[in-house]
C-alpha cells in the first residue's frame, strides 16, 4: 500500500510541474493567427473594435507577432487584416490607426519582412473590401507584371470587385501594374459612371497610367468627368486629362478656368493646359489650342487676389534643356504676348504675392533682360517690406540667368 501511494504521489508531482511549466514561469507568446477561424462582427483575430481603438503599434505587434524582428507571412497578413477595425471616412481615408503604425514601425525597426506578394492569396480571399483595398494600397509600392506568379490571381480579384472602396483603391494604386492589361482597362472603363464619387475621382487617376489599344473611350469618359456634379471629381479629372494630350479636352478645361466658383480646380485645369503646349521639363507637346486657352486665362479679369492660379502659373515658370529645340517648333507661341500678360498681372497690386512672384519667373523664361529690368520700377513702389524683398530676390535671381 505504501509503495502504491509513493508511486501515485510521484505521478501527481510530475503532472503538477508540467502544468506549471517547471520551476519558473514561461512568458506567454501569441498564438499563430488562425486563417480559418470564423469571422466575428467587430472583431479581427481576437481583437474587438473597442479595444483596437486604444491600441498602439506595440500593442498590436505584441498581440499578433511572436518575433517582431521577423514576422511570418501569416502574422504579417493578420496584421494587415486588422485594418478592418480602423475608421474610414466617405473619401476612403483611414483614420490614424494602429495597423498602419505597426507596419511602419516594423519597417523602421529593420525587421525582416515577408514579400507582400506572398500575402496575396490570403488577403484577396478576405471578405472585407476594406482589407482588400488596404492591401492594394500596399501593393502600389511593389512592381509586378504578368511574369509574376501572383499577377493573375490579384488581377482576377481586382476586376471582379464591386465594392466602391476596393475599386477606388485598385484604380489609385494598381493602374501602373496593370496598365497594358486589356481586361483591367475594360474594368476601369466599365466604372466611369460609378455612383460613388471616389470611384469616378480615381478613374481619372488610373487613366494617366493606362495604355489601352484605343484611348478614345477613355477621352470621352474624361470629357464627361470634367462636367461631373462633384467638385472633387472635376478637380481630379482636370489635373489628369492633360496627359491624354487631346485637343477635345481644351474647351472644357477653359470653361473651368472661366468659372471663379470652380477656383479650387483652376490649379489643375491650368496645369493640364500648360502640359499640352509647354510640357516642362520634357517640352514634347505642341497644342496650339491649349496655348490659346492658357493666354485667354492669363489675360482674364478676376475678383480673387489668388487668380490666376499661382500653382498653375508655376508650370510655365521654368525651362528645361530641350527648351530651345521645342521653341523652334512651337511657332504658335508668342513670347511678347506671354511677357505682356505676365507683366500686367505683376503690376496689379491687388494680386497675391505668390501670383505676382510666378509672373517674374515667367518673364524670365519668355522675355529678355530688358523685360525683367522694366519690373524694377513696380517693385520700388511696393509698400510691404516682405513683399518687396520677395519680388526683388526673385528678380535678381532671374536677371542672374541672363
Annotate the PLM regions:
Residues 16-19:
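C-terminal motif of bacterial Sec signal peptides marking the signal peptidase cleavage site
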Residues 21-24:
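Bacterial signal peptide processing site
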Residues 28-62:
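Post-signal peptide N-terminal segment of mature Sec-exported envelope proteins
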Residues 47-52, 58-70, 74, 78-81, ...:
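Structural detector for internal amphipathic alpha-helices that build alpha-solenoid repeat scaffolds
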Residues 57-58, 71-89, 110-123, 144-159, ...:
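Amphipathic alpha-helical scaffolding segments comprising HEAT/armadillo-like alpha-solenoid repeats
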Residues 127, 158, 162, 195, ...:
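Structural signature of alpha-solenoid helical repeat scaffolds
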Residues 345, 351-385:
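Extended alpha-helical scaffolding segments
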